[in-house]
């Protein structure tokens, strides 16, 4: 069983390398037309250049997974902001794409919790489609839209989870088919359990990104031993291995909050279930210390008898 690792957005080991610098709309409004254009251009350019630095760091450390920052283009989906963020940066998008393709990196996006399809308010669904379209356009500009995924949660229950799930199935029909084809769903820590998310994924033929921390915070009746093989099966129509999210609780009191690093004892039960299936899968680390937490966790895992480190960020068990 091969386990490959990655992390989210910011490389903590790199100095001054945020790929998510932004500008608020309030600040944006105070600028002249030319100043607005210059500011958007400068911030986006810096984010793209920082992303390139991070990709070089990932390549040097043999880190095969990476989640791009959704904030790579500031105010990209704001209705009052017009900005050709694709055409203005074609060489940089292509440079990012060339690095990803040459080194066979697995890239993803994870829009925020407001991108959902369970609301009964049409504008919420419209905004979700706008946001998904933005993420797809960025992947397309990079040249990896047909091989990369945009991950979201099912969405809020709005007082009636059953009705909300019904709305998801209706509202998702409004998302263009080529974008839906590149989306994944994740179980959340308060609303849709692992079993409920699995059922939705099976019905919609959407790959399921399993989050173990969320699962433990929002348990369902079905045991993980039954769920995980079916979760992995949702990836069978793709040409890539399943991906899971790993983090551990900040504390017992703040169980849903992510800790700085990974608590191996918290994760061990999941790993033992996965080992019984013996299916290759990828792991996205969601700890606060990102790449540093990932590398520490890999080091800890590799010290366990039977687990072999076969590259900087890949283990064999």
Swiss-Prot record:
GO biological process, any: pyrimidine dimer repair
EC number: 3.-.-.-
Keyword Hydrolase attached: yes
SUPFAM superfamilies reported for this sequence: Xylose isomerase-like (SSF51658)
Keyword Hydrolase appears in the UniProt entry: yes
Entry-linked InterPro entries: UvdE, UvdE_bac, Xyl_isomerase-like_sf
GO molecular function ontology, one term from the record: endonuclease activity
Superkingdom of the source species: Bacteria
UniProt keyword annotations, A-Z: DNA damage, DNA excision, DNA repair, Endonuclease, Hydrolase, Nuclease
Database matches in NCBIfam families: uvde (TIGR00629)
Similarity field: Belongs to the uve1/UvsE family.
Functional note: Component in a DNA repair pathway. Removal of UV LIGHT damaged nucleotides. Recognizes pyrimidine dimers and cleave a phosphodiester bond immediately 5' to the lesion.
Entry-linked HAMAP family: UV_endonuclease
Protein name: UV DNA damage endonuclease
Annotated source species: Bacillus anthracis
């Amino acid at each position: 069983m091969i386990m490959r690792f990655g992390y989210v957005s910011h490389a903590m080991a790199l100095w001054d390398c945020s790929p998510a610098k932004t500008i608020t709309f309030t600040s944006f409004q105070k600028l002249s037309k030319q100043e607005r254009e210059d500011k958007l251009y400068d911030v986006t350019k810096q984010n793209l250049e920082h992303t390139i630095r991070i990709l070089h760091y990932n390549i040097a450390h043999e880190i095969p997974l990476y989640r791009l920052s959704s904030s790579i283009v500031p105010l990209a989906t704001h209705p009052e902001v017009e900005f050709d963020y694709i055409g203005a940066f074609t060489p940089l998008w292509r440079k990012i794409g060339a690095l990803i393709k040459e080194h066979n990196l697995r890239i993803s996006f994870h829009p925020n919790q407001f991108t959902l399809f369970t609301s009964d308010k049409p504008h919420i669904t419209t905004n979700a489609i706008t946001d998904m379209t933005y993420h797809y356009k960025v992947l397309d500009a990079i040249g990896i839209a047909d091989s990369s995924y945009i991950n979201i949660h099912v969405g809020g229950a709005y007082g009636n989870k059953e009705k909300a799930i019904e709305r998801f199935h209706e509202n998702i029909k409004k998302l263009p088919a080529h974008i839906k084809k590149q989306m994944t769903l994740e179980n959340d820590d308060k609303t849709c359990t692992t079993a409920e998310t699995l059922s939705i994924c099976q019905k919609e033929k959407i790959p399921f990104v399993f989050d173990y921390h969320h699962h433990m915070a929002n348990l369902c009746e079905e045991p993980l031993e039954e769920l995980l093989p079916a979760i992995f099966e949702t990836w069978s129509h793709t040409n890539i291995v399943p991906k899971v999210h790993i983090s551990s609780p900040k504390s017992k009191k703040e169980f849903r909050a992510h800790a700085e690093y990974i608590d191996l004892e918290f994760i061990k039960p999941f790993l033992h279930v996965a080992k019984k299936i013996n299916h290759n899968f990828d792991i996205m680390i969601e700890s606060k210390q990102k790449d540093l937490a990932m590398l520490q966790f890999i080091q800890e895992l590799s010290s366990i008898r039977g687990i072999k480190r076969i590259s900087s960020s890949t283990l064999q068990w």
